[in-house]
């Protein structure tokens, strides 16, 4: 499929791999709903009020079965939605087909080119009947970046004149093409946006940087730093989905291997737990002395990547940073070392430096990089998200936590957006606790209650919030 020939005025207002997969997708959506109690209960609570009536949400987030349940929750609360995936490999094609069949335009399929990816990112802002999106639901910040960078390019084309990587080549070309058709395409759409809710660490970093520089054009909710997102999705989700991706891709026996996890934040903690749980010897690399000490106190060996490169069997990047595994590291690795990334973008591994060598595709999202001496390194998902590129991402239950936060943030921004300045906000503690409460019964948890005397003794309301905002869970 070639994005260059996709007609945005076509009567077919979607692009998916195969609409015939919709029946399969619907069956999996029905199963997922039973594991997503937060979203289901939010539907029940707010459906009569229709708090998102009039919201036109441009969504850029992995088009998975779990995301399908989120989309249908937003629609049940009154929103109109258009959707694209935030990663070229993460779409589950049957999920995309099922959501399209139910009436939501989706522009996503597994294995998009970068040109197609950025074309689809534009399509979520192309509403029929002269309407415009007024909300963004983002994961990684690409949809937000697109409107802001495009608006800047309307006034100064030099900002898209010098791409530094293949991603920027495709992005800048896509912006240039749209500006040739309509020189105010981006600013017209940017003017209608009430705010954005951002799902992941990388996108949140972008938002805080824009706020710091005075460039944030609308209010933003940092969903990632809700406790019921970062301490659950990032940790417990990765604890299950990392090894799922590695094993589906390679069938490798993890027990007995040396596995290196780069980064010991919430994502890295979950990855390290899962690898150790399957019998690997786990080493951690870190730049932060606090995180390094945490890793050491958990029994992990803290080393540098330079030390580990020629000794380990499996490498996982989880930092959100740039070239954490570089060309020299890969050149030093053992034959058939497995290299993968679970951070949002593909910049953590210097994949571009290996394009000079022969690549041998084993199967979708699994490649051998063949070095001049004959050594092979196994690269998963071309350095993009291994858990979504090589498997199906996090389990439904933990994603219900994250997506319940997203839904509440969308309601808050859409209904009370005028009360917020152009800054980055987090959901209040009482909503974080609400999200957790909605999920307890599904796993048989029973919550104790404070007596009046107990509440008075520790100085909190009987119904919460129970912790101060600065409390670290």
From Swiss-Prot:
Cofactor note: Binds 1 NAD(+) per subunit.
InterPro entries found in the cross-reference section: Adenosylhomocyst_ase-like_sf, Adenosylhomocysteinase-like, Ado_hCys_hydrolase_NAD-bd, NAD(P)-bd_dom_sf, S-Ado-L-homoCys_hydrolase_CS
Entry-linked NCBIfam families: ahcY, PRK05476.2-3
Record's protein name: Adenosylhomocysteinase
Chain's role: May play a key role in the regulation of the intracellular concentration of adenosylhomocysteine.
Enzyme class: hydrolase
This enzyme's EC code(s): 3.13.2.1
Residue intervals passing through the bilayer: none
UniProt key word NAD: yes
Pathway connected to this protein: Amino-acid biosynthesis; L-homocysteine biosynthesis; L-homocysteine from S-adenosyl-L-homocysteine: step 1/1
Coiled coil: none
Residues at which substrate binds: 64, 139, 199, 229, 233
Entries under Pfam families matching the protein: AdoHcyase, AdoHcyase_NAD
HAMAP family membership: AdoHcyase
Similarity section: Belongs to the adenosylhomocysteinase family.
This protein's record includes keyword ATP-binding: no
GO MF term set: adenosylhomocysteinase activity
Cofactor(s) in the UniProt record: NAD(+)
Location relative to the cell: Cytoplasm
Swiss-Prot/TrEMBL catalytic activity: S-adenosyl-L-homocysteine + H2O = L-homocysteine + adenosine
């Amino acid at each position: 499929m070639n994005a260059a020939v996709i007609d945005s005025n076509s009567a077919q207002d979607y692009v998916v791999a195969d609409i015939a997969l919709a029946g399969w997708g619907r069956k999996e959506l029905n199963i997922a709903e039973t594991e997503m109690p937060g979203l289901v209960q939010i539907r029940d609570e707010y459906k009569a009020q229709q708090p998102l009536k009039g919201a036109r949400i441009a969504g850029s987030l992995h088009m998975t079965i779990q995301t399908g349940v989120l989309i249908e929750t937003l629609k049940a609360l009154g929103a109109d939605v258009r959707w694209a995936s935030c990663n070229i490999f993460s779409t589950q094609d049957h999920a995309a087909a099922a959501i399209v069949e139910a009436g939501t335009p989706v522009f996503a399929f597994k294995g998009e080119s970068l040109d197609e990816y950025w074309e689809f990112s534009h399509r979520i802002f192309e509403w029929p009947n002269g309407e415009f999106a007024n909300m963004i639901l983002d994961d990684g910040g690409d949809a937000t970046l697109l409107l802001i960078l495009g608006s800047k390019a309307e006034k100064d084309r030099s900002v898209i004149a010098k791409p530094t990587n293949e991603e920027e080549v495709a992005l800048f070309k896509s912006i240039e093409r749209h500006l040739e058709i309509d020189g105010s395409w981006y600013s017209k759409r940017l003017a209608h946006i009430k705010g954005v809710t951002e799902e992941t660490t990388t996108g949140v970093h972008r938002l805080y940087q824009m706020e710091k520089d005075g460039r944030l054009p609308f209010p933003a909710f940092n969903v990632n730093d809700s406790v019921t997102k970062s301490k659950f999705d990032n940790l417990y989700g990765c604890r299950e989905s990392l090894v799922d991706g590695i094993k589906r891709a390679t069938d490798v026996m993890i027990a007995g291997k040396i596995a290196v996890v780069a980064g010991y934040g919430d994502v890295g903690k979950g990855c390290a737990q899962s690898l150790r749980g399957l019998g690997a010897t786990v080493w951690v690399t870190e730049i932060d002395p606090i995180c390094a000490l945490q890793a050491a106190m958990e029994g992990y060996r803290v080393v540098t990547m330079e030390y580990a490169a020629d000794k380990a069997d499996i490498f996982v990047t989880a930092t959100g940073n740039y070239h954490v595994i570089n060309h020299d590291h890969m050149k030093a690795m053992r034959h058939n070392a497995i290299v993968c990334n679970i951070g949002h973008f593909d910049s953590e591994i210097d994949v571009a430096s290996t394009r000079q060598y022969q690549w041998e595709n084993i199967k979708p999202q699994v490649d051998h990089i063949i070095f001049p001496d004959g050594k092979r390194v196994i690269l998963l998902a071309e350095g993009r998200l291994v858990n979504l590129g090589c498997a199906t991402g996090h389990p439904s239950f933990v994603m219900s936590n994250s997506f319940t936060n997203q839904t509440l943030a969308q309601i808050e921004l859409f209904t009370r957006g005028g009360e917020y300045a152009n800054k980055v906000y987090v959901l209040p503690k009482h909503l974080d606790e609400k999200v957790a409460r909605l999920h307890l019964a599904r796993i048989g948890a029973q919550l104790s209650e404070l007596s009046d005397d107990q509440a008075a003794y520790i100085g909190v309301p009987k119904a919460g919030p129970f912790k101060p905002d600065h409390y670290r869970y």
